[in-house]
């Protein structure tokens, strides 16, 4: 069991990296990767959101939305309902609630990070990496335990990617980059090269 969870975690971090394998959450990924400190802060926020939303959405799916999920009510009519068409709406609601709680927490206890993240903190709500993790969980039919491990792993993978990119971009400030590639140009090339590097993990059998 432990080996299964460990392989799932490693696969989520390296083999199926949200940013560098699926290119999810690229808007925030590019915009907040200018400084390592800010990138780490946002990375931790994404880890927290994914670690909570994926398992919670798993519970909602298996206890409320799936056909037969409402059998615990004792009503045959309710038990026969298939409410999976409400999945996207439910997942978005959970993600928005968790992000709002995180935003209020950072505003109160870590105002410097809250100000540094700016508009991109509430935009975690519409970060497709967050929704993508929940949809992957549904598609792969993860158990609750697997969804916890996958949520944390997906968050750690995204945080690792944005931190690495931020470190490279800080070094690029002192590099002789051609004028036509300064800014987003060299950043996109860097992300592409990082993605090629992470592709080497695709051959790992877990």
UniProtKB/Swiss-Prot annotation:
Alphabetic keyword roster: Cell inner membrane, Cell membrane, Ion transport, Membrane, NAD, Sodium, Sodium transport, Translocase, Transmembrane, Transmembrane helix, Transport, Ubiquinone
Pfam families xrefs: Rnf-Nqr
Organism: Alcanivorax borkumensis (strain ATCC 700651 / DSM 11573 / NCIMB 13689 / SK2)
Biological role: NQR complex catalyzes the reduction of ubiquinone-1 to ubiquinol by two successive reactions, coupled with the transport of Na(+) ions from the cytoplasm to the periplasm. NqrA to NqrE are probably involved in the second step, the conversion of ubisemiquinone to ubiquinol.
GO biological process: respiratory electron transport chain; sodium ion transport
EC number, UniProt record: 7.2.1.1
Keyword Transmembrane on entry: yes
Chief location: membrane
Gene name as annotated: nqrE
Bilayer topology annotation: Multi-pass membrane protein
HAMAP family with a match to the protein in the record: NqrE
Catalytic activity: a ubiquinone + n Na(+)(in) + NADH + H(+) = a ubiquinol + n Na(+)(out) + NAD(+)
Lineage, opening ranks: Bacteria, Pseudomonadati, Pseudomonadota, Gammaproteobacteria, Oceanospirillales
UniProt name for this protein: Na(+)-translocating NADH-quinone reductase subunit E
């Amino acid at each position: 069991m432990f080996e299964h969870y460990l392989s799932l975690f490693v696969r989520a971090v390296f083999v199926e990296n949200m940013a560098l394998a699926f290119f999810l959450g690229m808007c925030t990924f590019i915009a907040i990767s200018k400084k390592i400190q800010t990138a780490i802060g946002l990375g931790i926020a994404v880890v927290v959101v994914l670690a909570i939303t994926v398992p919670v959405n798993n519970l909602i799916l298996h206890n409320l939305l799936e056909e037969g999920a409402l059998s615990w009510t004792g009503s045959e009519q309710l038990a026969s309902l298939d409410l999976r068409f409400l999945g996207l709406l439910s997942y978005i609601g959970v993600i928005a609630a968790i992000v709002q709680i995180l935003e209020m927490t950072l505003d109160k206890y870590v105002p410097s990070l809250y100000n540094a993240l700016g508009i991109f903190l509430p935009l975690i709500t519409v970060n497709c990496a967050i929704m993508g993790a929940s949809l992957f969980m549904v598609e792969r039919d993860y158990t609750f335990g697997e969804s916890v491990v996958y949520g944390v792993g997906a968050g750690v993978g995204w945080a690792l990617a944005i931190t690495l990119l931020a470190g490279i971009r800080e070094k690029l400030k002192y590099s002789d980059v051609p004028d036509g590639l300064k800014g987003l140009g060299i950043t996109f090339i860097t992300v592409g090269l990082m993605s090629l590097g992470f592709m080497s993990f695709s051959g790992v059998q877990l």
